[in-house]
């Protein structure tokens, strides 16, 4: 029966494979998993929606300091798997080889490059944890975000074929990494602060966030299935190439065009007179958590938007039946109601 489902999935994939923007990989190339891969320690410090943003600290405006925020295809820098908290510090100090910020595309709307990179890294990490023991029950713990984050993996009989197992593990990893991104938006809304005393409500459900996260998951899945996950160096280089390619296909804008689009939606999507971290600097939010999504519609854009998707089933296996992110009571839950036992992904 499973063979029939894999055949149906294989027949469905050509449509995704012929997608001119982000084709799914059908010719699977396996690579050894990285047993000692450290987890992504923290999220990259970026970005409030808008550009040339003013800042206040401890309620006091900081004059002469602005956050530029705008990137171009030529200023992305080099991707670096986020394997230590020091990576976030380097980003803040401008010492990292990679750059993070916002970039406009005519078919994908605004893209937050930090969100793309974060979910790609989580997908790569989860794949390397899941693939060696695919089908076995297990738990993968992450640091607290209001609650204790636990990826619960369920027991099942996995496919017999090596490539089929590899493919299933990659898609499952992307699905779970996107659930982690979903929860981060919820946690920010309920008061999560990665830096104590610095509110992150400004960033919760920002209009470009989850589309960017899903883009990162899909990029990492393609990189894994193309055989570029055998080393961190190979993964990082593949991310550089894949990110530039998909942004080009989404019709990436120049710096001037991105800034002009920000100016057109000032007062509608964001308020340039507010300062970071004022919650109402961001006026437009997107609360849609789906894995099948269009970018938040941008006024004045005439190009058709590009739909990003994650399949519900791979080879007859429903991804949500194989594992989920669970949130258990934490030490500091802020405004989040305490669950009776835990919040599963179905409660998001």
Enumerate the predicted regions with their spans.
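Bulky hydrophobic segments
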Residues: 18-202, 221-348
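Alpha-helical segment that forms one wall of the substrate-binding/catalytic cleft
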Residues: 212, 216, 220-222
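Sec-dependent N-terminal signal peptides
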Residues: 4-13
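Divalent metal-coordination and catalytic microenvironments
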Residues: 185, 209, 215
């Amino acid at each position: 029966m499973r063979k029939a489902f894999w055949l149906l999935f294989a027949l469905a994939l050509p449509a995704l494979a012929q997608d001119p923007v982000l084709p799914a990989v059908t010719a699977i190339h396996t690579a050894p998993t990285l047993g000692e891969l450290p987890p992504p320690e923290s999220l990259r410090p970026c970005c409030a929606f808008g550009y040339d943003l003013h800042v206040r600290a401890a309620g006091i405006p900081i004059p002469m300091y602005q956050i530029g925020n705008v990137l171009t295809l030529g200023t992305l820098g080099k991707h670096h798997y986020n394997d230590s908290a020091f990576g976030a510090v380097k980003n803040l100090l401008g010492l990292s080889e990679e750059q993070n910020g916002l970039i406009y595309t005519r078919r994908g709307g605004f893209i937050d490059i930090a969100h793309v990179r974060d979910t790609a890294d989580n997908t790569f990490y989860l794949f390397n944890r899941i693939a060696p023991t695919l089908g076995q029950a297990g738990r993968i713990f992450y640091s607290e975000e209001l609650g204790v984050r636990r990826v619960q993996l369920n027991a099942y009989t996995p496919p017999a074929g090596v490539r089929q197992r590899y493919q299933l593990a990659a898609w499952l990893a992307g699905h779970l990494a996107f659930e982690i991104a979903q929860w981060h938006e919820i946690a920010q809304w309920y008061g999560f602060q990665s830096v104590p005393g610095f509110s992150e409500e400004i960033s919760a459900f920002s209009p470009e966030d989850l589309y960017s996260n899903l883009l990162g998951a899909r990029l990492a899945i393609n990189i894994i299935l193309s055989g570029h996950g055998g080393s961190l160096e190979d993964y990082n280089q593949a991310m550089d190439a894949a990110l530039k390619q998909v942004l080009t296909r989404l019709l990436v804008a120049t710096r001037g065009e991105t800034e002009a689009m920000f100016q057109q939606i000032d007062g509608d999507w964001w308020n340039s007179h507010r300062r970071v971290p004022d919650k109402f600097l961001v006026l437009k939010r997107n609360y849609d958590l789906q894995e099948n999504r269009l970018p938040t519609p941008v006024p004045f854009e005439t190009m058709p938007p590009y739909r990003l998707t994650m399949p519900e089933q791979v080879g007859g296996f429903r991804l949500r039946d194989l594992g989920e992110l669970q949130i258990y009571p934490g030490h500091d839950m802020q405004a989040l109601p305490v669950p009776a036992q835990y919040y599963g992904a179905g409660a998001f």
